[in-house]
Amino acid sequence: FYLEYHHRQELSKIQNACIILISKQEMKLRLIDYKGQEIFCAPVATGKNVGDKRKQGDMRTPEGVFQVSDIQRATDWKHDFGDGKGEIDGAYGDFFIRLLVPGHKGIGIHGTHLPESIGTRASEGCIRMYNEDLKKLVSLIYPPLTVVVTPGIEDEVANHL
C-alpha cells in the first residue's frame, strides 16, 4: 500500500510540473506542462535595453534559468518611473510574481498600467503582461516553478560587445 501511495504522490508531482519559457525575441511567455505541451501563451514586454542584466538599474531583463520565489498581491503597489508623473497606482497590476535571480533583487513578472507597452522593450527589467493574462497565469502556477528567459538576436549581439 505504501509504495502505491508513494508512487501516486510522485506521479502527481510530475503531472503538475510546469515550466515558464520567456522569449525576448518573440516577446512571448509560454507555460509548458511536463509533456512539453503549451498550456498558456501570452505577449509580454521586457527591459528597455537589450542584453542580459548586468547591474541594478540597467533596464535589462535577466537571461537564464530562475525560480518563482513568491507570488504577491500588488493591487495597492505604486511605482515612480522617474518621468515626472510621480507615483503611479496600479503600475504592477494585481500580482507580482517574484523571481529568484542571483545577484539581482526586485525582478519579476507583473501586470501594467500601460497595456500599449506589451510586445515592446519597455520595462525597467521586469517582464510585463496584460493584467488579464497575469491573472490567468497566477491561477496556473505556484512556487518554486522554473522560469527560463531566452535572449533575442539583439540581446546576443549586445552580450558579445
Spans of model-derived segments:
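Gly/Pro-biased beta-strand-loop elements
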Residues: 2-107, 157
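Exported/periplasmic cell-wall-interacting domains
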Residues: 74-161
